[in-house]
Amino acid sequence: KKKNGMKVALASTVMLLMVSPAFAQKYKVAKVERTRILVDQKWDAQPDAEAARFIAPYKSKVDSIMGPVVGHIAHDMTRHRPESELSNLLCDILVWGGKQFEEQPVFAVYNMGGIRSNLAKGKVTIGDVNDMAPFENKICFLTLKGDKVLELFQQIAHRGGEGLSHAVRMVITKDGKLKSVTLNGEPVDPEKSYRVATLDYLAEGNDQLVAFKSGTDVFAPKQKENNVRYIIMNYFREMQAQGKVVESKIEGRCVVE
């Protein structure tokens, strides 16, 4: 909306005006008030019986779809810059996912903004993965020359860190400058080509990671099953089939000095 040439944002505001056409012109909005209501577990203490009855048949169906367990994690995993257990795990899963496509990426990048929830210790359900990765992002592989890889890491440093896979060790400054970076313990060779795993969203240069737009030999399968959340679920299922509890830790992939 615009008022007096200025944009006016109305958040969490619902206005219901029920007037007949004959009287509509007599009414003018005198004031609009808004408030935010935090929807959290405090509302569980006194559930509305009528609302619960209405939701029950739908909840049962949703729970049957989202409730199945795909794996287990050893401890709570959260996402935060410059490095986190959860972002580390997701990037390692992208590298792992390469085998499905006969790809061998040197490293992977997953944007922190694409991780929409944390994981709690114990069971991981389909619903947990959907909450964490709700977007229709597909796994993507591309090739970057070393000079563009360095440019990419500079852009990641400017953002204060993003999700990086195990091969990466980078040091950044508090004001977002890249101090150093290695891949598998070796300096990045500006003339060498590197295969990278990421999301198709990032491969388009989004989230200010424009170096990705220089990628060549881009492979981003668009089938539904190549959605990143299904790659994540498949990883958990494979670990569960092997009797493994999934672990991840902070190990200096991105350090601020």
Per-segment meaning from a language model:
Residues K26-D40, S84, N88-C91, V95-G97, ...:
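Feature captures C-terminal
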Residues K1-V32:
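Bacterial Sec-dependent N-terminal signal peptides
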